[in-house]
Design a protein with these regions (language model features):
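N-terminal small-domain helix-loop-helix segment of the aminotransferase-like
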Residues: 1-83, 90, 274-275, 396-398
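Generic structural signal for small/hydrophobic residues in well-ordered secondary structure
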Residues: 22-25, 66, 78, 102, ...
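PLP-dependent enzyme catalytic core of the Aspartate aminotransferase-like
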Residues: 72, 333, 341-342, 347, ...
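Conserved PLP-anchoring active-site segment centered on the Schiff-base-forming lysine
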Residues: 94-116, 143
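Helix C-cap/helix->beta junction micro-motif
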Residues: 119, 187-188, 301, 356, ...
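Active-site phosphate-binding strand-loop segment of PLP-dependent enzymes
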Residues: 130-207
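Conserved core segment of the aminotransferase class I/II
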Residues: 214-288, 292-300
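Conserved glycine-rich beta-strand-loop-beta hairpin in the small C-terminal domain of fold type I
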Residues: 270, 286-295, 306-336, 366-371
Length: 398
């Protein structure tokens, strides 16, 4: 049985009532009219889209557009899903066996660890740690975890799951670290699943890593139009892999879920992918401007917050400095009772929502240190919300 999805339950409760969403991971979206304006001649094609079932693996033309994002896969090595979440559920249902070792970077988007756990896997966390001004995912720790697998005795290969750029920290491995991870997986015959939904939003494009499906025969790349493209409403995600047998097994599971994607969504997704450069450039600019504003804000308030700038993606993960003890303290009422009696991000989040209509995401939604909280960089309204927050903190004498 699946545990409650803490992050999604939090958003279900607050996302559509909060005035300012200062913690969302998707970038600024657009209307259908705006999307069609990028390719006016496509409007007739949308109007003539047949509203019957679509091909279960995805419209061939859409899969061809997706494959063009990669160097080593073609349209037959792409499997379209109704968003990335369905892809996660279907993939792990196809792959995971009772007692199999699944190593997952931590913290993580909950389904990356919870789905394997619910399917009977032995889930081992691979920890990101703040180290010398960056969030570090240590390949040496992965090597140790893979060694633990040797004693598992299930006969199934280990599965390594990582997310780059990382949610919620914005971490990115160096190319040398990435190559070491791939090499470790090759040596152990591990399947490497990489959640690449924030790819193309690297702060410095030179830090962009290859897609794992391009560099490793057992690599599986997961992506979606929700994040870098900002088109979450289309509900189009996909898996790309050289291992067609894995995609075939996953497609069999998909028959029990969505079966196929929405025909209008596939048509609109094709338009978006043909104009990826324009759409992603717009969202990259929004993220870059917001990152600069947040960096100034945290520099001015370094007595209150610890700040490690993200190297990529549309989220970051600051930490409260002030509060009782180590900052892990959460009072029973989940209320902020004063500067000297302790402060948790959950308590701060509650007060910001009640008084300002600003939504931040507490680290406890990642089963992590509650002094941390997630902020989002991809929305235009972030600057206005940050100004309001800054003024409010001044009024509190902080």
């Amino acid at each position: 049985m699946f545990k409650p999805f803490e992050l999604e339950r939090y958003f279900a409760k607050h996302e559509f009532s909060a005035r300012y969403l200062l913690c969302t991971s998707d970038c600024e979206s657009m209307s259908i009219r705006e999307l069609l304006s990028l390719e006016p001649e496509a409007e007739e094609g949308l109007h003539s889209t047949w509203l019957g079932y679509t091909e279960s693996r995805g419209n061939p033309m859409l899969r061809k557009e997706i494959a063009a994002l990669y160097d080593s896969v073609d349209e037959d090595e792409v499997l379209v899903h109704a968003g990335a979440e369905e892809a996660i559920l279907n993939l792990f249902t196809a792959l995971v066996r009772q007692g199999q070792t699944v190593i997952v970077n931590s913290p993580c988007y909950q389904s990356l660890s919870e789905v394997p756990r619910a399917l009977g896997a032995r889930v081992l966390p691979w920890h990101l740690r703040p180290t010398e001004g960056r969030w570090f995912l240590d390949p040496d720790e992965l090597a140790e975890l893979l060694a633990i697998h040797e004693g598992g005795g299930t006969g199934a290969p280990p599965i390594v799951v990582m997310n780059m750029p990382h949610n919620p920290t914005g971490a990115i491995l160096t190319r040398g670290e990435f190559d070491r991870v791939v090499s470790l997986c090759e040596n152990r015959g591990a399947i490497l699943v990489c959640d690449e939904v924030y790819r193309f939003l690297e702060t410095d494009p030179r830090d962009r890593l290859p897609a794992v499906c391009d560099v490793y025969e057992n690599g599986i790349s997961l992506s979606v139009l929700s994040k870098a493209w900002g088109l979450a409403g289309l509900r189009i995600g996909w898996l790309a892999a050289q291992r067609r047998d894995i995609l075939d097994l996953t497609a069999q599971v998909k028959d029990y879920n969505s079966i196929c994607a929405s025909a209008p969504s596939e048509t609109l997704a094709g338009i978006a992918l043909r104009h990826s450069d324009e759409i992603i450039a717009r969202n990259w600019d929004i993220c870059a401007n917001n990152l600069a504003a947040f960096s100034r804000f945290f520099a001015d308030r370094e007595d209150m917050f610890e700040w490690i700038p993200p190297r990529g993606g549309s989220v970051a993960f600051p930490r409260l400095r002030i509060g009782g003890g180590s900052g892990w303290w959460v009072n029973a009422e989940r209320k902020w009772t004063g500067k000297d009696s302790g402060l948790s991000a959950a308590a701060l989040a509650e007060r910001l929502l009640e008084e300002l209509g600003i939504l931040i995401l507490p680290g406890i939604c990642y089963d992590y240190d509650p002094a941390y909280f997630r902020i989002g960089l991809g929305r235009k309204q972030a600057g206005e919300a940050l100004t309001i927050l800054d003024q409010w903190l001044d009024a509190q004498g902080l």
